[in-house]
Amino acid sequence: QTCALPISVNNQDITKIKDKDFADFRRENLGFIFQDFNLLDTLTIEENISLSLVINKRNPADIEKRVHAIADKLGIRDILSKFPYEVSGGQKQRCACARALINEPKLILADEPTGALDSKASRLLLETMADINKKMQATILMVTHDPFSASFCERILFLKDGKIFNEIFRGEKSRKDFLLISDIVS
């Protein structure tokens, strides 16, 4: 269903982008973190992460540098030469996250990004996403049932039966204070 209002991403109204140009826009401006990874089994972890940069014809040295930097941040550097079927679910999720973040997108759409991760990997991913939000002014739209994950967000919408029933702006509240508030509100 189309929206009557303009939807702006990176100062561009996406409702006016022609179908033939939308794939390029999406590849350059959006990052997707899926609950079920969506990795290509015939590519290594490194190739999965770098795919959008390769398609955009980035410099190979720049690609390698960026892949290694994001892999280091997410603790997956040691599995870059492996294939998705050779690694754990948590490692696949971190690979999927690296792939979404590699292009430094202006909008990241994340569906339960920490669902398959242990607490350490979850914290690493959420801190990386918060860092990207601050440094690159990227907007992150995250679906989660986890108050810990939501505590990294500045604005939280609570949905019930498809409708917003509450909203919290964290503002200057600490993540710990937010966790207490979110327990009461939800």
Protein language model annotation of sequence segments:
Residues 4-152, 159:
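ABC family nucleotide-binding domain
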Residues 163-186:
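Conserved beta-strand-loop-alpha-helix hinge in the C-terminal portion
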